[in-house]
Amino acid sequence: RAALRLLTQARIPGLVPDVSVPEGAPIARLTLAVHAPELDDAPVSQGLLVAPAPADERPVAAKALSHLTIKWPWLADQLPPHTHLLRLSYGRHGEAEPAVTVEGALRDIRTLTGVTIAAEAVTDRLLARWNGTLPPLPPEYRSRVGALEDQVRPLGGVALTGAWVAGTGIASVVSHARAGAKGLL
């Protein structure tokens, strides 16, 4: 949003930024280290996504579960036997900041994997929160951003980048930023 504000305030002749960056969602990610031999067989492989539904119809509060020690085996190599790292993601666009507890996460894990993990099996936890993450960007938004990039390109010495241009995810943003920087050289 800041870059878009700067472009608008610069009053560049012919530049018409027809882009409105959508409001993001408050997100919480709870990562649990658990001693759970029952997870050694990876009941949900690397993880799963939970389809959106009205809050009162959801079987779980989480929107995703990642079995990090299956997704990235090098993590498992760093941990004691039968220790697993599970990351649960909470928060959806248009909803209030999610209330996240270890107890609630263990219920979600049981529902999603069929594995019951006792609270005493949780050996560590980390809760990270942030606001303003972008929702999935629709094609019409991407078209508007593309048109804005076309307007900025002839100015020389300026490239647009960031999640609002490249899409979400570090890989998308980094590769887009590198391409933009290369175009400036």
Stretches found by the model and what they are:
Residues L65-L185:
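Conserved flavin/dinucleotide-binding core of flavoenzymes
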Residues R1-L86, G91-P98:
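Mid-domain catalytic core of redox enzymes
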